[in-house]
From Swiss-Prot:
GO MF term set: damaged DNA binding; DNA-directed DNA polymerase activity; magnesium ion binding
Upper lineage: Bacteria, Bacillati, Chloroflexota, Dehalococcoidia, Dehalococcoidales
Subcellular location: Cytoplasm
The encoding gene: dinB
Cofactor(s) required, per the database record: Mg(2+)
Protein name in the entry: DNA polymerase IV
Family membership noted in the UniProt record: Belongs to the DNA polymerase type-Y family.
Amino acid sequence: MSIRRVMHVDLDAFFVSVEQAVRPEFKDKPVIVGGKPERRGVVAAASYEARKFGIHSGMPLITAKHLCPQAIFIEGNHQLYREYSEKFMLILSDFSPFLEPMGLDEAYLEVTGFESLHGSIAQMASKIRRRITAELGINASIGIANSKVAAKIATEQAKPNGQCEVPAGEEASFLAPLDIAVMPGIGKKTEQHLKSLGIDTLGKLAALPASFLKSCLGTYAPYLSNAAMGIDNRPVEMPSEAKSISRETTFETDTRNQTFLEAKLSYLSEKITATLRKRGKQTRVVQIKIRFADFTTLTRQKHLGQPASGNREIFQTALSLMNGILDSDRQAVRLLGVGISDFCGPEKQLEIDPAKARLEKLDASLDKIRQKYGFSSVQTGRTYRLKDMF
C-alpha cells in the first residue's frame, strides 16, 4: 500500500508576480498592488522587495507609502490574474486529476502512487515549478507531506521559490519547533492567548492534554491537537460548482451619485451574467447588497418569474432592488454588490420572442469578444460612463 503524499502548490506573491511578468520594468523593485496611496484602500499584494520595508497584505496603502516612499503603486487587474490562475490550474491538472484549488494562487494535489510517472514526488514538484516558471514567468513554492496541513506549512517553509518535502513519519518532528503562528486556523487572538500561556511552538501545542486544550479553544481543539502533529485526514476534494455568483465593490469615496451607482451596478451585473452564461446556466434569484457610509448593510432579493441569463434582465431586476433601498435611505453609499443564485439549465423553447432572441445574440457576441480580447474590450453605453467618473 502506497504511503499518502499530498502536494501544496502556492504561487509566490501572485498578484505582484503577474504584474512583473507582463511588465519586466517592475522586476526586482518594490511593487504594491492595491491602487494609489492617496485613495482609501489596502495593500492587496506586495513584492518581496516591498516586504523588506515591513509592508504586508491588508495594510492601509497610506501606511505602505510612508514605509516605502519609492514603492511602485499599481491598480489590480483581476481579469489578468484570473487568466493566469486558469493557466496555473491547467498545468497542475497535467500532473494529477485530483486537484483542489484554494483561491486563485494555490492548490492541493493528491499525488499518492505517482512516483512511477516522475521518478519521485520531489522530481514531480521540480517539474511543476519549472513549467510554471517557463509558461507563466512566475515562481511557485511547493510543500509535500502526508497531509494537507503539513504540506501547506511545508510550503511556507519553502518560500520563496523553493520546495520542501516532509518525509513520511517525520511530520511531528518537522512541525515541533515551528511557531504556532504558522498553523492554518490559528489567528492573531488565538496566537496571543496561547503564547500568554507559554505555548509558542507546535510541539508544545501537540503535547498539551486534550482536556486543557479544549478548555482553551473549545470544539476546535481536537483538530489543532492532531494538526500540530501533522495528522489531518481531510481528502483532496475536487471543487463542486458554486451555488451562487456575486460581485461587489467598495468605492474610493462614499457617493450618492445615482448615475454612477447605476453604471457600476450595470458593470457588476454584466460580470456575473457573463460567468453565468459561460457555465451554461440560468438564474432564478437576483440579490442586491448596499453598505452605507455608517457601515449599515442592507440586502434585498427577488425571485424571477422565469429563469434568466441576460444582462438586461438581471440588471433591471437589480436596479429595481437598489432603487427600493435608496428611496428609503439616501445616505452616501460605501459598497455596492449584486449576486445571483438558484441556478438551472437553459430552458428549451419552441417559440422565442424576437426581441429576446436579439438580446441573447447580443450577449453571445459580447461574450465571444470579451473571451478573446478581455472583458473591458467592449462596453455598454451605461458602463462606459464610468470612464468619465474617476
